[in-house]
From Swiss-Prot:
Listed name of the protein: DNA polymerase III PolC-type
Organism from which the protein derives: Lactiplantibacillus plantarum (strain ATCC BAA-793 / NCIMB 8826 / WCFS1)
The keyword Transferase belongs to this UniProt entry's keyword annotation: yes
One GO MF term: DNA-directed DNA polymerase activity
GO biological process, one term: DNA-templated DNA replication
Amino acid sequence: MSLNQQEMFEKLLEQIEMPTGPEFTEAAIDKLTVHQASKVWEFHLHFQHVLPYTQFMTFQNKLQIAFKEIARVTFTIVTDDTEVNGRELAEYWEWIVQHSGIKSPLVQSLCNSNVPTYEDGRVILLAENEVIQNFLTNQALGPIESTYHRLGFPKFSVHTMIDESASQAKIKEFHEQKAKSDQALAQKAEAAIKKANEKRQKQADAPAPIDGPVQLGKQINPQEPAKQMVQITEEERSVVVEGYVFDMEVRTLRSQRQLLILKVTDYSSSMVVKKFSRNADDEAQFAALKPGMWVRVRGSVQEDSFMRDLTINAYDINETSHASRQDTAPADEKRVELHLHSNMSQMDATNSVSDYVKQAAKWGHPAIAITDHSGAQAFPEAFAAGEKNNIKILYGVEANMVDDGVPIAYNDAHVDLKESTYVIFDTETTGLSAIYDRVIELSAVKMVKGNVVDQFEEFIDPGFHLSETTTNLTSITDDMVRGSKSEEEVFKLFREFYGDAIVVGHNVTFDIGFMNTGYARHHMGPITNPIIDTLTLARWLYPNLRGYRLNTLAKKFNVNLEHHHRAIYDAETTGHLNHLFLKDAEDRYQVQFHDQLNDHMNENAAYRHARPFHATLYAQTQAGLKNLFRIISLSNVEYYYRVPRVPRSVLNKYRDGILVGSACSSGEVFTAMMQKGKEEARQKAGYYDFLEVQPKPAYSALIESGLIADTDHLEEIISNMVELGHEMNIPVAATGDVHYLNPEDKIYRKILIHSQPGNPLNRTERPDVHFRSTDEMLKDFDFLGTETAHEVVVDTPRALADQFEIVRPVKDKLYTPRMKGAEAEIEKLTMDRAHAWYGNPLPEIVQKRVDKELKSIIGNGFSVIYLIAQRLVFKSNKDGYLVGSRGSVGSSIVATLSGITEVNPMPPHYRCPNCQYSHFYTNNEYGSGYDLPPKDCPECGTDMVRDGQNIPFETFLGFYGNKVPDIDLNFSGDYQPIAHNYTKVLFGEKNVYRAGTIGTVADKTGYGYVKAYERDTNQTLRSAEVDRLAKGTTGVKRTTGQHPAGIIVVPDYMDIYDFTPVQYPADDQSAAWQTTHFDFHSIHDNILKIDILGHDDPTMIRMLQDLSGVQPESIPPVDPHVMKIFSSPEVLGVTEDQIFSKTGTLGIPEFGTRFVRGMLEETHPSTFNELLQISGLSHGTDVWLGNAEELIKDGTVTLAEVIGCRDNIMTDLIHYGMESDMSFQIMEHVRKGRGIPDEWQQAMKDANVPDWYIESCLKIKYMFPRAHAAAYILMALRVAYFKVYFPLIYYTAYFSVRADDFDLVAMAHGKDAVKASMKAITDKGMDASAKEKNLLTVLELANEMLERGFKFSMVDLDKSDASDWLIDGDTLIAPFRAVPGLGLNVAKQIVAARADKPFLSKEDLSKRGKVSKSLIDFMTENGVLSDLPDENQLSLF
């Protein structure tokens, strides 16, 4: 089976012996190019984030060493990072300078003498003077920027600034010594070259990678004792430590020596270990070291002034073996873990499911189960890990089960509630177990018609000392019970007291449990009287109360409770509440008799009030998996209350194919056995397919909290569970309730739980719940005897695992939706418009293109995808909102003709709208049809349409047309929710879902958890230990979310549970959409995802249309006046000096940024094709800087001729005469930064492709699709049209749609005030905040508007809109949201209150408009409220 890109990368890590880590999550090899002639292998890698420098150096070194004998290795990294990390920028600096190709030793020296800083979004490099600044700018910055980008850093520019602190004397001295310095530098350069040659020779002579274990320095005597790191508290001359390497870095210093930095832990603490290389042998040893190794280190402990921590300066470092846990059981007697939590158990477990599967396979276990809390989000990873490690995966979940309704009454009897006598009783006990604890006070009141007629109150001597906890909770002391009556005597007296009355209690099942267990102990029968539980009675009658504790209810219903947790007071209070509740039940529900109460036990969302208990549910079959998905979905969507809940009736309904286990100490069987004994447990156990018992340490919290007295009682309970299983013929399996892999990982879970202050798990010490081997598990159950222990640990789990079919949680192919007649409809839409545009019969060039595309689209089942997009676009256009396309959909003429995109991919051509005459240009005469000169039809004289962007279909669906189309559509942000909801109309509400995401603990969050734990536990941890602990908490599920645009479409012949469970994002039950439970990346190859994006451009176009009445489609794509703004602002009636810009493109999409405006200034585009080039160049990587920019500057080619978009490569090469398939392959390689194989380069040369073209291709790392650029440019030109011809309407739309930050006072005061405000921001330089930088962009447009002769007005209480700017003559009236500190909600409130009636005063505005005093003051100071008095005034007439 072929490997995917991620699996290929994992294989690479294995080959170079690089341990995996979170830095390599989802890492992939995008492409590997092998140059056979030059023996160069080019790796193109994709990581989520820029690698930490230590990891990068390790990875690079291991890669070089691994392939040293095969080829020279180069690599390029692409990451998902969008922001520069200043720390990483600085850490990489020396390496970047050394490897950026800077040839001048002087320039290298200047770079090495400084390190850039990253402040407020800018990378700054200080220079002592202008000379150095020019050296850096002209010779260093471009290569440095490109090299950073090659390592995955986001695209950025380095800005040089003069260091004002440099003295004038130093500057003068520099000029005087320039000649001398140049000579010295030349000599230094010569020496450097010589040294570099020597180094290369030295490296060539360097020893091969080491074969044996790492040994740096001398051998350390294995018998020499190692000191625990936690015991190292001060500097020491010599110390030996032994530990696990969890992080490392190798730095190459300016001296060319290497510095090894290890982070090592022995799990008592962690320390940083440093060592400098002495020779090439040391460097080879450095390269052989890797995270995951165990090492012994001897060195001195010193305070590191830079790290401000104790570090070990190593003399010797020896790789050492470490005895990891083994499973020594025979192969056919290995256990199977049936209860295990991965890091997808929200904030409760630490290891990935892959970690567990790998360990289980290493131990030889035949299978392993996954049972995360309430979810299945680890299933896709578990499936992949199972296949990789050849181990059977049992897919399960630990569910929060609830009874659908808890009985209100017990021992139903047809007795009149009004006329009955009630005995309301309460007990005080020594604990919660009716088996192991005792009643120490029994009190009751007898009531008739709400009046107390008798009392019963007795202490009971339990025969043992009361614990401090019991006394604190009940206020009962030893003295109070000592010498009291016995339990048997008091229980007999109480039976006489209650007689035939109705027995009542609050949470009465607890008290009845103690009473009936006591009666059984004394050979008396249980209570058979009718019973009422006021707790469930209150929950039924009053389902929306926040709490149902006795004291809470007493306060709510004004019933006096003198001393809560004393039995007599609790009993009397319960009696009065019972009287009130039964009267209410009669009035509201006509309940008259005791046996009517339980008719209502399932009402008012009773599942919300039932106490959840745990059960483990496993999918034994594929049908069972679907049922499990359904159950998980229902628990998250319909029965969510604080946690996802599974009503017993839901499990009963969908139990087919599901195995049910009794779970952990929170399961109902174990709880019953612990609290009420074997007979109660027997009643519960019959529901389960197997019973679970767990190692004694897993129950430690029960002993600590007093629920179980001691270990002896715990062993008795576990033994009783096993006996019960034997008696009922129910299998009993020993399970681990695993939450982490190894014992030392316990601390990570502890930190996670500590980060949740309200988590009840914080009340006790966390138990030992690591993944246990067969040996460890047998030892934990040895108290059962050898035979029984083997049965529950080995035999039963293996037998259960054998009952499972091989289940697949992820499909193996794509399932697209069906729409009846989609193929015929797409074909008809295409052909109808084709004939309307080009006539019938079609021109051969059109017919061939249409036939080719329809064959691919229909033949591969893609018609429905096209039709979905067509329906969405059609509806949006019909509703008045244009849709912009993203990606390569504009490469398809079928998409164009069916109305999905406005981009026409045919070669440039004329077509007559009247007689359908057409003429195509197929020899690259024009880059874009929009650039054709106006021309009348030679047949009928009609002005012809000019169209065609010359884009090959292959860029969309691949060379063979079988690639699944990815149609991304840009809808107006205002219209996006409507477009999303329209998919429900198209497919039905049960067939569309938002694409789900999973939010996990990130590095910084984990660091914060550790620091909080350190603070709250009064510890002082070394920085290395903080790093280790933070690493252990990362990747754990925190929450869930949804993709902002992705809609998942389920085909009508399947349902969502065939693919994934569903839920609400972040468990928000008020959310409008349900999401996939699986992260959408897990199922993206199995089910269709449509990206319906929200974008400002369509919103702005709609507003421009509404204000002007001009239909956007009627705007010519290329207007001569509009095109002038790309070269000069003069067409706007302003000069460069007035608006501080050499172009008129401020505020124009795609062309308004400083970077792109700089490109415009250099290239002066005048055609649509050249604008396409600019768009492609600005979005690509290594396409403009150091590439096309230089080709244009030195006159090699023009803007129109450089490679701008990916599609140009294929069409250009075909034009040169190359075969279309090779042209396509070269385009694909180049656009992804994979280079060009030598044989293809030769083919290009044979076709007379210029050298500059080939060299340009080789530099490119990423290229923009031409169709995407064309759609963006078309939208931008429409916006620009309004800026030129309808200026005030344009500015209204811009400030309403695109601007969020305003300086309203400056704008209202005119251009001088605006310019002053702009200067105040620019003067701050790097110190300007992000908000100020955003404001500067808005002020640039405000200044331009003012310079064009228009004005701004302060908000107008009577006219202003809440959010949009309004036109009033030549003035724009500000909306209320433009007032500093006035949010949109308040703005809407002001407008709503104004519509109701005019404001009478400032007081009235404050009250009805919800306007704060500070906002009132602002408006008053700026003349907005000049006509309003301060307060309302009464009129006498």
